[in-house]
A protein has these predicted regions:
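Envelope-exposed proteins and targeting segments
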Residues: 43, 58, 106-108
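Bacterial N-terminal signal peptides that target proteins for export
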Residues: 2-16
Length: 138
């Protein structure tokens, strides 16, 4: 009986480990995407800030961007177009916006022409979305 119980416990551990392996890989992929996104953020730094102590610049600070209402960063003077855009930032909306900000929200103030590489946009989102509203990391 003891041998059978040992086999069951061992089999359960193997199955649990196999189930967790893809999750560990996913975490590593997200971390890699965020690292790549950090490098891509260099294109944004002239106008935007993120992290502890970030302040509005030519563009709004981007802490807590995930699930934030568009045009709602305190203390930033948004264009009427972005104030009334009526969407919440999520990965899909961010990707659409970053491809061509002027097309997604005509009349917004963002001068950046956009990014064409979907993987770069996804990596940038992975980087930005790991910041809480106070600039701390999630």
């Amino acid at each position: 009986m003891e041998k059978k119980a040992t086999r069951i416990v061992l089999a359960s551990a193997i199955v649990a480990g196999a189930a967790a392996a893809p999750l560990a890989g996913a975490g590593a992929a997200v971390a890699q995407d965020a690292a790549t996104g950090h490098a891509s953020f260099a294109k944004c730094q002239a106008c935007h800030a993120v992290g502890p102590g970030a302040k509005n610049k030519l563009g709004p600070e981007l802490n807590g961007l995930a699930d934030r209402q568009a045009g709602a960063t305190a203390g930033y003077q948004y264009s009427p177009a972005l104030k009334s855009a009526g969407f919440t930032w999520d990965q899909s909306t961010f990707a659409d916006f970053m491809q061509n900000p002027r097309t997604k929200v005509p009349g917004n103030k963002m001068a950046f022409a956009g990014m064409r590489d979907q993987s770069e946009i996804a990596s940038l989102w992975a980087y930005l979305s790991h910041f809480n509203a106070d600039g701390s990391s999630k």
